[in-house]
A protein has these predicted regions:
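Alpha-helical segment proximal to the catalytic Tyr-Lys
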Residues: 107, 152-153
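Active-site loop of short-chain dehydrogenase/reductase
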Residues: 63-64, 109-123, 156-159
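Canonical Rossmann dinucleotide-binding motif of NAD(H)/NADP(H)-dependent dehydrogenases/reductases
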Residues: 1-18
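Active-site helix of classical SDR
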Residues: 102, 139, 147
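The catalytic Tyr-X3-Lys active-site helix of short-chain dehydrogenase/reductase
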Residues: 3, 97, 126-129, 134-142
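Catalytic Tyr-X3-Lys loop
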Residues: 73, 80-100, 119, 143
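Conserved mid-core segment of classical short-chain dehydrogenase/reductases
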Residues: 51, 55, 74-88, 107, ...
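Conserved Rossmann-fold SDR core element
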Residues: 63, 144, 154-170
């Protein structure tokens, strides 16, 4: 998406080797036609898909130093009226996808023993919920807590965990 690609360009401008993961095959093919870096089709909601992608990254680059976890879908509705299926889908997209990537990255970073960084796109919804955005905000609030928990659990390994609020970006996520 928009935020992910802009983040990619910024990291490339600093000389980083960057790998893009996306579940949207059409978008991924479009990106691959524009850039020379590794793009991997991956459903980050699926642990096996994440493990396969991270194995491919490690085979090409030898490890992972920074994870930028940017998955998300803006699912809205009044929280007392949305179906359980919608709420569960939002937690898969906006929380478990991040947990799947972070837990796999942590395994790699610990083996590398050279520190590391987890960076989560959290959203203002985690701290300032908006009307009818509960299905999006609740998993983003859980993601903020997850980010803090990784910092507590893995800081002693030199692995940092931080979150960003990419607010006011016209990415198309909200329309």
């Amino acid at each position: 998406g928009t935020i992910g690609f802009e983040t990619y360009k910024m990291f490339k401008s600093y000389g980083a080797e960057v790998v893009l993961l996306d579940y949207n095959l059409k978008r991924l093919k479009d990106l691959q036609s524009k850039i020379k870096d590794l793009c991997i089709h991956c459903d980050v909601r699926n642990k096996k898909s994440v493990k396969k992608a991270f194995t491919q990254i490690c085979e090409k680059y030898g490890g992972i130093d920074i994870l930028i976890s940017n998955a998300g879908t803006a699912i809205n509705g009044a929280i007392g009226e949305v179906s359980d299926d919608i709420l569960r889908q939002s937690f898969e997209d906006n929380f478990f996808s991040h947990q799947n990537c972070a837990s796999e990255a942590i395994k790699i970073m610990k083996k590398q023993n050279i520190n590391g960084c987890l960076l989560f796109n959290i959203s203002k919804q985690s701290v300032n919920p908006g009307k009818n955005f509960g299905p999006y905000g609740l998993p983003k609030s859980a993601l903020l807590s997850l980010c803090k928990q990784y910092a507590v659990d893995y800081g002693s390994y030199g692995i940092r965990s931080n979150g960003v609020n990419a607010d006011r970006i016209r990415s198309g996520l909200m329309n």
